Each structure stands twice: as C-alpha cells, then as structure tokens.
From Swiss-Prot:
InterPro entries: CATSPERD/E (IPR028751), CATSPERE_b-prop (IPR053816), CATSPERE_Ig-like (IPR053815), CATSPERE_NTD1 (IPR053818), CATSPERE_NTD2 (IPR053817). Belongs to the CATSPERD family. The gene is Catspere2. Glycans are attached at N62, N114. Residues 1-20 form the signal peptide. It comes from Mus musculus (Mouse). GO terms for cellular component: CatSper complex. This is Cation channel sperm-associated protein subunit epsilon-like protein. Keywords: Glycoprotein, Signal. The keyword Iron does not apply.
Length: 775
C-alpha cells in the first residue's frame, strides 16, 4: 500500500510539469552493479511517444509503452532511443558483464550508555528483495540475495525513502546460504583502518557488529569474503556513520522562514556528514538527518522577525550545534533552545553581512587534532571579513583598507569583497575582490589567500575582468594546489595549478555562455566532489559537466523537466542525488529524492565525443588525508601508472606550502604485452640537524609546519575514473601524543596524582637538578 501511494505521489508530481524527455532506472541505488543481470526501467515523459528503438542484443517487455523494462544479456554499449513525434536524444548505455550482483543492507541502533553502536547486517538481492528492503527502511536483516541492479534516477520512491520494517524471506535464505559458504562481513574504517567483526549468524539471518561511536573515523565500508553464490558476489558498501545527528521538532506557533518568492532551492549540508542537511525554499525550510528520507520544518519563533524579514532569507548554513541564517544583511543563530540575532557582542557586524561560508572538504584527522584553534565559518561585508570560532563567536580578520595597503592600491580606488571561501588547505581561506579605479562597465577580479597560522594575506596571480553587474561565486576544488572554479549567472571561469592556468570554460563549439545553451537559464548550483567531478546545474535543470584540470564543459542528457524545482546533493555514500520539491503535493510527498547516474551519463555522451583516458590504471598506497612526521622519521609513498606502450606517461608530484621537507624518488619501469608499467617510490624526510645547535627552538620553529602533496598522471582526460590523491604531512611534535600510565582499571573515576623525572644529563639546557613534572 505504501509503495502504491508513494508512486502515485511521484506521478502526480511529474504530471504538473510534463515535457518530452526520457530516463532509465534500476532497482538499486548502487550503479556499480549495473550489468547484464539488471532490470532496466525505461520511462518517457511527454505526449509524443510512439515506441522504443532497441538493439537486437536487448529485449524490452512492451515496445510501445512509455514505461517499460529493458534487459540486455550481452555486455557492451547499447544505443537506446525513443521514437516520438519530437526528435529525442539517444543514450548509449554501458552494460557490464559483472559478477558483483548482491548488496549489503544494515540498520543501526545507538547505545548511549557506553557510546557504542550496534550494526545489524544482512545481504539482499535487489531483484527479489521486499519493497521495504528496496526503500532501505528495514529494521531487521534481510537474508535473500539475487542479482539486482538499480538506476537511482528511475528507482521507486519506496526505495528512496527507506521504509522497510523487516527482511524479506528471500534475503533470509540468501544470507544463510552465503553464511554456509563462508561469507562473514566486517566493517572497515577508512581513516584509522580498523576492522570490526560480527558474532555468529543469528537465527533471524543477520550478523551483529558492535563498534564505538566516532567523530574522527566516520567513513566506513562493509566488506566480506570472496564468496560466490550463483556466480555472484556482494558489492562493498561505503557509508558514513558517526554520533547521531539530532534535529529539533518545531514547537506549535512558529512561523515559516523562507527565501524570497521565486527563488531556486538552496541546500546546505554538514561538511563531513552529507545526510545531515537543510533545504530552503520560497515556501518553507526543511531539515533532515537521513538524506531527506524524513524531515522536519525549520521555522522562526514569533516576535523576532517581521513578516518581510521571514521571507528574505539570503543564505543558510547547517552545523551540528546550530543553524546560521542570513536574513537580509543580518545573521541569526538557531540552536536547540534559542533563536537570536548575532551582533557586536559576538564579534560580528549587526548589519551589512553579504554572505556566509563554511569548510567544504572534510579533513577529519586534522580537524580533530586542532579544531579548537580554527574557524569553521566565514562571514563578510563589502569591506570586512569575519572568522567564526566555537560557540559561534566571531573575530574580524581584515578590512579593505588593510587590503588596499597590502595590494599597494591608491586610497581612492574602489575595492570590495565579493565572497570568501575556505580552500582545501586546512589553514587557509581566500577572498575574491572587486577592484576598479574608475568603475564604468567592468570590474577587475583579484584574489587574496589568508593563512591563519601566520595571520597573513597574500595576493594570488589570478585576475579576471567581468561585467560590473556580475554576481560571482566560487569553490576550491579537491587539490593540493589552489584550484578554483568561479561562476556568474552565465559563465564559468577556472584557475588551475596554483593559478598558473586560468581562463573561461568553453564547450566543444567554443561557446562560453552556458545560458545560451540552456534556453537562457541562469546558473543555479555548482557541485564538486573529491574525485574531480564538477556538475553545473542551471535553474531550468539543464546540467553541464566539467572535470577538474579540464577547460571544456559538456552538456549532459536532459534528465529533469525544465519547470521542476530541484537541487543537487550527496547521499550517505557521497553519490550525487537530485532533490525534488513540489509544494502542491501532500506534505509527506513534497520532497522526493532520486540518485543520479553521473558515470553512466558521462559514458553515454562520451560515445560521440570519443574522449578516452590515456592510461589504464593509476594506483597508490595513500590511505589517509593526514600523515604526521616527527624528527628523524620518514614516510614512503608508492604510486604506479599503467598505460599503452609509446605514450610516454609519467607520475607528477606537486606540493604546496613551506619547503621544510626533502624527498627522493626511485622509478621502476616495465614493458609487457604492449603496456608500460611505471612505479614511483617517493621517500619524504627532513635533513635538518638539531645536534649541538645554539638556536634549537628557533630552528625547530622554522622547520615545522604543514605541507600538502598530490600525485597525478602527466596526462588525463574527462573519462579518467581515478582521482589524484591529496594528503597533508604535518611536520613537528604530535599534539595527540600523551604519557600513558598502565596498570589501572578504566572503569573507575578515582583521581590519581603522577609525576615523572627526566635525568638532568639528558636535558638540552644545563640544570643543577633533575627535571620533575607532575601529571
């Protein structure tokens, strides 16, 4: 019954905004198992459909139905096209003959008394699983596994909202069969590389794993043994798991807080937990902790904002401890127990605030190591930049008067702050500035980067000239070097490799105005991820794709109707999803989500573009974003590239930051069967000699700090699947190290006094007595 109601709601949603386009779906949200064993749902949206044009290697259940199921039993690239009175685009679907068919399903129970979490795991087959399992809301494990592939864009609403209550019988049988064959899952944590194993299979056909709650080891993977059943294995499941992210129910009588009428959707999510998100619309504001499977309204208490102010929301940022709203030009803070205006008592201007910005990249270990001394939010006016610290207290970082002095500009010139963003470097942020001597029709755009370790601003070799009325935004990409994407309403600009290369993104035809290729629509949203994907979404839902370090954009196949209200965000596996909003539906159906098969869509358009990756494989042993190196220590990194013979590729090491490390490199080369394998061994170390120096502490200060590195192939293209590994090396004393005292029971809270003694002969400074320290 639930499935029928949800599907009916989605159909009603689509009926309000019909135009000719077509999509495809599978039963799973994990496109890595898209294969010859998948049931591919085809859906044509519009009134001019006649039939489907299908290759002989595939079969369709009903060729004349706008909604039907496709099966392709032969691996390869299959061209699918609807025959309609209007000319429709064809797609080239890449169907693999994969042995990965089954999926893991899990539920989580939070145990607060010992800060642990119980994870119940079972295996399910998307093709034969229950409706509840498909919508990912089962509370008990499902043990049946059959081959099942699903397309997120065509998945049922039930699959997307996860409403299953118990495992299906098929999943129960499958899990027991896999267990008999030797399957035994475990949870692997990506950052700390820990493994948590279950007890024996329960009578309900589930494995139960106990693991601690964590804020610095949240990226996890469910993996299993290499066990085959009916020639199929289980796909690894990547997900995020941390302390429960609570959302607050609004008391009765609170009033809507919205964007101005006609505004496109605005999304904000937690830096590390993308499932904890907030959506602002011109009707309501919503908050979720499960990727909009469920949600609550976020409203303002009466008496604080006027009616006009409540409908003048300009920006919003969501954090675990509160939500920041920019209403007109004033910042308001909403927490569990208050809704207040921030002013000079919090270190920030009461009016004139133009925008808010937060960290875009999750750097868990570094954040955990020194979070107390770093900002987590930025705010700015035309002439001032503020940094926000713990408890939402701010400090002014700079003014345009100081920046004019830094840039050696005449006092009479006009210099304004456009926007401010954090870079990938954990200690840096950057301000985009507008400068003109005589402001006529254009303005010059410059950039300065702020380093919080030295409290310094540095002008970058980046300059653009844009129309005076242009409204600019930008993002730093996932890169050791400062790489950025800047955009206004119509164009996208780039600055790559520490601004050594910059310009305007073009299409294959040479067009730079994306609005002219999307019926005059403006740029709405730019989504970036950690593997170099950049998706540019227009207000009418036309989407363009840009790859990091590539200067050309390609238009993606139409997926969403031009009148639908949508936004892009990441699900719990950090895959791209589309969020739909329709205020005309029943309240519980107003928000719908669908995973978007970005990789399949890229493969489809590339069939005509002929853009292929120049290498076959690029591998490395970089398993963390953060490495610490103390005196006398070294770090060895292994990287390897495999490419066709005579291409002459190699691996490039790039770094950003203080030159306080030395490294040596050794290259191994091998040719076999027309392919070259080049392996690069890099060893990082320090050559500073601290023995018997008079300026020990000064020398130590000069040779400690943070460097950011990345390895990348010398050539790459839009279709290269692997990301360049980016990592930090922190050189110096590890502040997380402590003196450990053994031999005591941890269950008690009895305070004990300890002390230690260091022999005076071992100390650098001459002392008459041994050094005694109390703990």
């Amino acid at each position: 019954m639930l499935a029928r109601r949800v599907v009916a709601a989605l159909l009603l949603w689509l009926s309000c905004c019909v135009s000719a386009l077509w999509r495809y779906y599978i039963n799973s949200q994990d496109y890595s198992i898209f294969s010859t064993r998948s049931s591919i749902k085809l859906e044509y949206e519009g009134n001019s459909f006649v039939s489907w044009k299908i290759p002989e290697s595939c079969k369709v259940e009903n060729n004349t139905s706008p909604k039907t199921t496709l099966h392709c039993k032969r691996a390869g690239i299959h061209t699918i096209e609807p025959i309609a009175r209007n000319q429709e685009v064809e797609r080239h679907l890449t169907v693999d003959n994969s042995y990965i068919c089954y999926l893991w399903y899990f539920t989580v129970v939070d145990v607060y008394y010992n800060l642990s979490q119980i994870v119940t795991i079972w295996v399910y087959d998307p093709e034969s699983a229950s409706t509840e399992e498909l919508i990912r809301t089962a509370k008990k494990p499902s043990l049946i596994v059959t081959i099942w592939v699903y397309d997120p864009e065509s998945a049922s609403t039930e699959e997307l909202i996860w409403t299953a209550k118990k495992p299906s019988l098929n999943s129960l049988v499958l899990t027991k069969q896999m267990n008999t064959l030797g399957q035994r899952p475990f949870i692997f944590t990506v950052e700390k590389r820990l493994a948590y194993h279950p007890g024996p299979l329960t009578s309900e056909g589930t494995w139960v794993i106990h693991l601690p709650m964590s804020t610095d080891d949240i990226a996890k993977v469910i993996q299993g043994n290499n066990v085959d059943f009916q020639d199929c294995r289980i796909a690894d499941l990547h997900f995020l798991l941390t302390f429960p992210m609570e959302i607050v129910l609004e008391p009765p009588g609170y009033l809507p807080l919205t964007l101005p009428p006609g505004s496109p959707l605005m999304l904000s999510w937690d830096t590390c937990i993308s499932t904890f998100a907030l959506l602002a619309t011109d009707q309501e504001t919503f908050q979720t902790n499960d990727s909009f499977q469920t949600w609550t309204r976020v409203r303002a208490p009466p008496g604080i904002l006027s009616d006009a102010q409540r409908h003048s929301l300009r920006d919003v940022l969501v954090f675990r401890t509160g939500i920041l709203f920019l209403v007109e030009t004033t910042v308001y803070l909403k927490t569990d127990n208050e809704f207040i205006k921030l002013d000079k008592s919090r270190g920030i201007s009461e009016t004139g605030i133009l925008g808010l910005s937060k960290r875009r990249w999750c750097q868990i270990r570094y954040l955990y190591k020194s979070a107390a001394g770093r900002t987590f939010v930025l705010a700015w006016t035309k002439s001032e930049v503020y940094g926000g610290f713990g408890k939402f207290k701010f400090m002014r970082f700079t003014t345009t008067s100081r920046l004019k002095y830094l840039l050696k500009l005449p006092p009479t010139d006009t210099l304004e702050i456009i926007t401010v963003e954090y870079s990938w470097h954990p200690l840096e942020a950057a301000a985009l500035l507008s400068h003109c001597s005589v402001c006529t029709t254009t303005k010059n755009i410059r950039m300065v980067i702020f380093n919080s370790a030295y409290f310094s601003w540095k002008l970058q070799d980046f300059e653009l000239q844009v129309p005076k009325e242009a409204k600019l935004e930008y993002r730093f990409l996932y890169s050791a070097m400062p790489d950025i994407i800047v955009w206004d309403e119509h164009q996208v600009y780039y600055g790559y490799r520490n601004f050594a290369v910059f310009g305007t993104i073009t299409t294959a035809s040479g067009e730079t105005n994306l609005s002219s290729l999307s019926q005059g629509s403006n740029i709405h949203q730019v989504l970036t991820d950690s593997i170099g994907n950049v998706v540019v979404k227009m207000e009418n839902n036309v989407m363009f794709y840009i790859k990091a370090d590539i200067t050309e954009a390609v238009i993606l196949h139409t997926w969403v109707n031009t009148t639908a209200k949508t936004g892009l965000f990441f699900d719990k596996s950090f895959e791209v999803c589309i969020l739909y909003y329709n205020e005309n539906l029943d309240e519980k159906y107003q928000l719908q989500t669908q995973p978007y098969p970005l990789i399949l869509e890229l493969q489809s358009i590339n069939k005509d573009l002929g853009d292929w990756c120049p290498y076959l494989a690029f591998q490395h042993n970089i398993h963390s974003q953060f490495y610490h190196m103390d005196k006398g220590e070294s770090l060895t990194i292994w990287s390897q590239i495999v490419y066709p013979e005579n291409r002459g590729l190699y691996i490039v090491l790039e770094h950003y930051g203080m030159r306080i490390l030395t490294w040596t490199q050794n290259i191994e080369y091998e040719i076999a069967s027309g392919f070259c394998t080049k392996t690069l061994i890099t060893r990082f170390f320090q050559t500073t000699n601290y023995e018997l120096v008079d300026n020990y502490y000064q020398l130590q200060k000069e040779n400690t700090g943070l460097l950011v590195f990345q390895f990348r192939p010398s050539e790459f293209s839009r279709m290269c699947p692997t990301a360049k590994p980016v990592f930090e090396i922190d050189v110096g004393c590890d502040s997380s190290k402590h003196i450990m005292v053994q031999g005591f029971n941890r269950s008690g809270c009895q305070r004990r006094d300890f002390s230690y003694v260091i022999d005076k002969e071992l100390l650098r400074e001459s002392l008459s007595d041994n050094l005694v320290r109390n703990l």
